[in-house]
């Protein structure tokens, strides 16, 4: 299996390339309780239209082993830059889902030398009011492993039109997590502070699920309002919950393609 050594981390990744010269490179960061394969169908749609797509498992998720060292939004951002360095990619469009939707704007604000644009899919707006919920989640996983998450999230976190196969994949993603790694990534969200949204000067697309309870529309609108660039767009996906790329993959691909064409 393909791994990259990024500092002290061993990161499992995939690099999907189109035939011929790529129009642009995208790098994708998944969210809590997920893996690079959350994006698989989206990447195949984009590769078919000439884009290079890099996906990877966050440390402690999927096939990237947990290091037992605490992580943060900043260290996760460093991982993305490290992957780009290792693959000799000078600049890329960064895509982040959920927790990754905190990391992507952090990079857009602080590393615009490496970021072409940012796409935030169901981005979480860091909020102290969410801390008790994550503390309860950590306690449940410490006691019972990932089973409680797998028994609730696949139905609770999606929109009413989510296909059964999407729920099945969400369940598999959750059951496949290392509980210690999952807890570590919960703590990243607990400790997260809002990125410097006003500093962002690259184009930004936000995809918000109309029925998203994990990253509610109100928070997505708040992020949109705080983003500094005038080159920004908020798309509200009807009847979609928090797992956009599994619930409505074709729509996600079309929205990303449309946004990319607009910023050229």
Predicted regions and their residues:
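Flexible "cap/lid" loop of the alpha/beta hydrolase fold
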Residues: 102-110, 114-148
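Conserved alpha/beta-hydrolase catalytic His-Asp/Glu region
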Residues: 128-132, 142-199
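Short alpha-helix in the alpha/beta-hydrolase fold that links the catalytic acid
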Residues: 202, 216-225
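Short beta-strand/loop motif that positions the catalytic acidic residue
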Residues: 200, 206-208, 212
């Amino acid at each position: 299996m393909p791994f990259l050594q990024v500092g002290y981390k061993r990161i499992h990744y995939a690099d999907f390339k189109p035939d011929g010269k790529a129009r642009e490179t995208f790098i994708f960061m998944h969210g809590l309780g997920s893996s690079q394969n959350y994006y698989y169908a989206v990447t195949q749609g984009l590769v078919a239209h000439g884009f290079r797509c890099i996906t990877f498992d966050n440390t402690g998720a999927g096939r990237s082993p947990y290091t037992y060292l605490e992580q943060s939004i900043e260290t996760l951002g460093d991982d993305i830059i490290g992957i780009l360095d290792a693959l000799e990619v000078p600049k890329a469009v960064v895509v982040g889902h959920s927790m990754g939707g905190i990391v992507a704007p952090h990079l857009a604000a602080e590393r615009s030398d490496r970021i072409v644009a940012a796409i935030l899919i169901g981005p979480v707006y860091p909020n102290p009011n969410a801390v008790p919920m994550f503390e309860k989640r950590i306690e449940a996983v410490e006691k019972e492993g990932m089973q409680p998450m797998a028994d609730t999230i696949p139905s609770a976190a999606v929109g009413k039109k989510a296909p059964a196969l999407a729920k099945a994949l969400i369940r598999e993603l959750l059951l496949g997590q290392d509980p210690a790694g999952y807890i570590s990534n919960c703590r990243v969200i607990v400790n997260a502070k809002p990125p410097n949204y006003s500093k962002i000067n690259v184009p930004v697309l936000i995809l918000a699920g109309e029925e998203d309870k994990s990253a509610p529309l109100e928070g997505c609108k708040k992020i949109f309002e705080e983003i500094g660039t005038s080159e920004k767009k908020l798309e509200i996906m009807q009847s979609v919950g928090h797992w956009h790329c599994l619930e409505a993959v074709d729509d996600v691909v079309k929205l990303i393609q449309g946004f990319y064409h607009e910023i050229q």
